[in-house]
Amino acid sequence: MDLLVDELFADMDADGASPPPPRPAGGPKNTPAAPPLYATGRLSQAQLMPSPPMPVPPAALFNRLLDDLGFSAGPALCTMLDTWNEDLFSALPTNADLYRECKFLSTLPSDVVEWGDAYVPERAQIDIRAHGDVAFPTLPATRDGLGLYYEALSRFFHAELRAREESYRTVLANFCSALYRYLRASVRQLHRQAHMRGRDRDLGEMLRATIADRYYRETARLARVLFLHLYLFLTREILWAAYAEQMMRPDLFDCLCCDLESWRQLAGLFQPFMFVNGALTVRGVPIEARRLRELNHIREHLNLPLVRSAATEEPGAPLTTPPTLHGNQARASGYFMVLIRAKLDSYSSFTTSPSEAVMREHAYSRARTKNNYGSTIEGLLDLPDDDAPEEAGLAAPRLSFLPAGHTRRLSTAPPTDVSLGDELHLDGEDVAMAHADALDDFDLDMLGDGDSPGPGFTPHDSAPYGALDMADFEFEQMFTDALGIDEYGG
């Protein structure tokens, strides 16, 4: 079973993220399927950023950020977000308070100049896998503890996100410093050239105009890929570790019914429950099988665990279906930028004077020349009051369980990278099976173990059955699930 779990996550991440740790071998029966996250596994390894970048053109600076993060797929993923209508990000906390003192994000060019001239890049090692002070929860012994498990896993995610975001904020400051110094050097060169041609221009005015024209646009571009890396990689690490535990305890989820407050809770990147086999509803309305397949299509492309529900999935239907893009509806990229802008606008919103606050609240009095980090139609949507995003987050799902005797099991095995049967390879090498085929013709009567039972043998003896270890039954159930067998002998 250990080898099966190891193979399950062998090629989890195509973007360079470490796969979840394997299930520990030789431990006690109540050992969780995966060790506590960041305890001794590969996910605990730090990811240190290189030294701060030098002033280079924005395009080169952007490529440097991708290289430092090991996130070459970042631009393609940003483009992919523009092809989906799902709201993947509104359920995530903005942590806008972390940016209230980030002067480099001010929408006043004079503030950026003052900050850039005084800022010294952080040269100490920056670990973008910093950890919070909340322990990774393990699955409860009984299903009655699933509610507390959901809350504990959410607290762990929020703590890890906040701890990491502080490191990502420092990385963004270093790159914004390099961007500012490049723009300042470019403006100084243009100023010297203009002076040599007899056209005296104010250097400060030229610098502020350049910042207004290029700094905010390039900063938003850097922030977009930086925070996508933060959300995507952290969610992958936590959910795949939780998935490794949950798939080993189907008894906890066979009767689980989950009623969500909003669809955003299910569409969001972070979904603590990957198996809800009893019933999956939003305010009492069952989730359509097509909607779940479309959502799982997105999660599959983002390399996140699929959300499985025996009550929702249609027997024989594929687990994923490409969603249809509706051009007149909000897109995932727009929701993502709303989340990013909440961070980038935090400093200016926090330091705004009362008169400026009035202008911000009244669209007719806004200055057309005011600097900003871009806009999206998602930021202009008039959401109903019961579905409006809140910083405090949505209410926890309402959990219940099916009555005894109504257990539901998945009819389709979870997608894995494990090959069974003729496609099985051992240690990456082709093994000749000709000698093993000879076992099919082997006569077991030669060993004295024919069809006739020996003396003293009682059919269906209960003593040997009761002596079996519970781990044997867990492995047998996992093996039949992997083969897609609903009933023994199916």
Curated annotation (Swiss-Prot):
Q: Name one GO biological process term.
A: DNA-templated viral transcription
Parts of the chain that traverse the membrane: none
Q: What is its main location?
A: virion
Classification via SMART domains: Alpha_TIF
Q: Which domain of life is it from?
A: Viruses
Q: Where is this site: Critical role in activation?
A: F442
Cite the Pfam families for this sequence: Alpha_TIF (PF02232), HSV_VP16_C (PF12149)
Locate the region Transcriptional activation. Answer: 411-490
Q: Which UniProt keywords apply?
A: DNA-binding, Host nucleus, Host-virus interaction, Phosphoprotein, Transcription, Transcription regulation, Virion, Virion tegument
Q: Where is this region: Disordered?
A: 12-37
Subcellular localization(s) per the UniProt record: Virion tegument; Host nucleus
Give residues where Phosphoserine occurs: S18, S353, S411, S452
Whether Nucleotidyltransferase counts among this entry's keywords is: no
Its GO CC terms are: host cell nucleus; viral tegument
The record's function comment reads: Transcriptional activator of immediate-early (IE) gene products (alpha genes). Acts as a key activator of lytic infection by initiating the lytic program through the assembly of the transcriptional regulatory VP16-induced complex composed of VP16 and two cellular factors, HCFC1 and POU2F 1. VP16-induced complex represents a regulatory switch: when it is on, it promotes IE-gene expression and thus lytic infection, and when it is off, it limits IE-gene transcription favoring latent infection.
Subunit details? Interacts with VP22. Interacts with gH (via C-terminus). Interacts with the virion host shutoff protein (vhs). Interacts with VP11/12. Associates with the VP16-induced complex; binding to host HCFC1 activates VP16 for association with the octamer motif-binding host protein POU2F1, to form a multiprotein-DNA complex responsible for activating transcription of the viral immediate early genes.
| Domains as described in the record | The transcriptional activation region seems to target many proteins of the RNA polymerase II transcription machinery.
In which family does this protein belong, per the annotation? Belongs to the herpesviridae tegument protein VP16 protein family.
Which protein, by its recorded name, is this?
Tegument protein VP16
Instruction: Tell me the organism.
Output: Human herpesvirus 1 (strain F) (HHV-1)
